[in-house]
Swiss-Prot record:
DNA-binding region: 46-159
Cellular component terms per the entry's GO annotation: nucleus
Name recorded for this polypeptide: B3 domain-containing protein At5g06250
GO function terms (MF aspect): DNA binding; DNA-binding transcription factor activity
Pfam families (UniProt xref): B3
GO biological process: leaf development; leaf shaping; meristem maintenance; negative regulation of DNA-templated transcription; regulation of DNA-templated transcription
Protein keywords: DNA-binding, Nucleus, Transcription, Transcription regulation
Length: 282
């Protein structure tokens, strides 16, 4: 008779693996939390859509003057003093930024008297190549809320706008579609002597059928060839002519009219079996 002994080494191995898994999970959660807090501590400064010259061979990014003077002010002597040396103002200073991965980027920031513009020069072309930036892409700048010396730089592709604008566009499209559907669900006319031909509305069959399923509740009472349908709070009796070869049958029903629809006929069509219901509003 053989006895299998539980290996002590195996027990220690399992215990070590469990501890490692717990440590990895805790580290991942801590990193995620730290990243979230880090992003929350960033203050957005400004952004700029890149021009062809910004990503071209000129090796420079033009910073809009209002943003440059507000967030990256150079020494006032270098910019505004009449006695300032042009070479000193164009030499400028070095600015350090962190990208989304934490990598540090250093750019020379200066003021060009010739074009009267603030620019990032040395080091900019490396950033363009590393991120593979193209004209129309957007770069944005941020600053740490509690440590103003920490600056951040980020970027996004052209056309990647905010979700709110996309949601607003989708909402407008949906509203427009519902308006068009409502118009074709019910067609009201004043004192028609003859109802419109079925072919005039046949291409609206699918939309109207959907509306009928949504807004009407069919009754379980079906006697012979008649069918009772409740539509918009009104019980309608649809007479089906079984001997008629034409699948388009018009049925007239007199109901109490809402305000503003006195003496009007309302025509309602189904896609299958292509019946038309005429509501005479009193």
């Amino acid at each position: 008779m053989s006895v299998n002994h539980y290996s002590t080494d195996h027990h220690h191995t399992l215990l070590w693996q469990q501890q490692q898994h717990r440590h990895t999970t805790d580290t991942s959660e801590t990193t995620t939390t730290a990243t979230w807090l880090h992003d929350d501590l960033k203050e957005s400064l400004f952004e700029k859509s890149l021009t062809p010259s910004d990503v071209g061979k000129l090796n420079r990014l033009v910073i809009p003057k209002q943003h440059a003077e507000k967030y990256f002010p150079l020494n006032a002597v270098l910019v505004s003093s009449a006695a300032a040396d042009t070479s000193s103002s164009e030499k400028g200073m070095l600015l350090s930024f962190e990208d989304e991965s934490g990598k540090s980027w250093r750019f020379r920031y200066s003021y060009w008297n010739s074009s009267q513009s603030y620019v990032l020069t040395k080091g900019w072309s490396r950033f363009v190549k590393d991120k593979q930036l193209d004209p129309g892409d957007v770069v944005f700048f941020q600053r740490h809320r509690s440590d103003s010396r920490r600056l951040f730089i980020g970027w996004r592709r052209r056309g990647q706008g905010s979700s709110s604008s996309v949601a607003a566009t989708n909402s407008a499209v949906n509203t427009s579609s519902m308006g068009a559907l409502s118009y074709h669900q019910i067609h009201a006319t004043s004192n028609y002597s003859n109802p419109p031909s079925h072919s005039e509305y046949s291409h609206y069959g699918a939309a109207v059928a959907t509306a009928a399923e949504t807004h009407s509740t069919p009754s379980s009472s079906v006697v012979g060839s008649s069918r009772t349908v409740r539509l918009f709070g009104v019980n309608l009796e649809c007479q089906m002519d079984e001997n008629d070869g034409d699948d388009s049958v018009a049925v007239a029903t007199t109901v109490e009219s809402p305000d503003g629809y006195y003496g009007q006929n309302m025509y309602y069509y189904y896609s299958h079996p292509h019946n038309m219901v005429i509501l005479t509003l009193l």
